[in-house]
Amino acid sequence: MANESNNLGLEITELRLGLPGDIVVSGESISGKKRASPEVEIDLKCEPAKKSQVVGWPPVCSYRRKNSLERTKSSYVKVSVDGAAFLRKIDLEMYKCYQDLASALQILFGCYINFDDTLKESECVPIYEDKDGDWMLAGDVPWEMFLGSCKRLRIMKRSCNRG
């Protein structure tokens, strides 16, 4: 009977352990070893597969949202001067007090600014727009409160506001 099954060509449908496509000659015996013998040298010089980046990853919307949140932490405000055709953006966090800001604006725009209201000798008056949209005189509130509420800074010439 065993001879008859060999002659029928049932080797194709025979179930056996091993990799698909391995041809086992009927005369060979299958060893029960789990690992290859030390005599067999496996020389695989294949490079590991490179990780392909998925198209559209990271999502652009979340990337922009994350970066825009980081930018809002800095306190850049627009500064305009009456009579000047240009605006400048400055970071208020760079300055420690009103006097530091006044000296920087004096260098930037070339007009003498004093945030102290008692001295009337300055040629320019700085005002700012707060979060509510109201225009306030700069220097009237403490510096920390000014940093938190200033959205825009405007420097008005004294000759223009006397009317």
UniProtKB/Swiss-Prot annotation:
PROSITE patterns: PB1 (PS51745). GO terms for cellular component: nucleus. Keywords: Auxin signaling pathway, Nucleus, Repressor, Transcription, Transcription regulation. It comes from the Eukaryota. It is found in: Nucleus. Its main location: nucleus. Belongs to the Aux/IAA family. Homodimers and heterodimers. Aux/IAA proteins are short-lived transcriptional factors that function as repressors of early auxin response genes at low auxin concentrations. Repression is thought to result from the interaction with auxin response factors (ARFs), proteins that bind to the auxin-responsive promoter element (AuxRE). Formation of heterodimers with ARF proteins may alter their ability to modulate early auxin response genes expression. This is Auxin-responsive protein IAA5. It comes from Arabidopsis thaliana. The gene is IAA5.
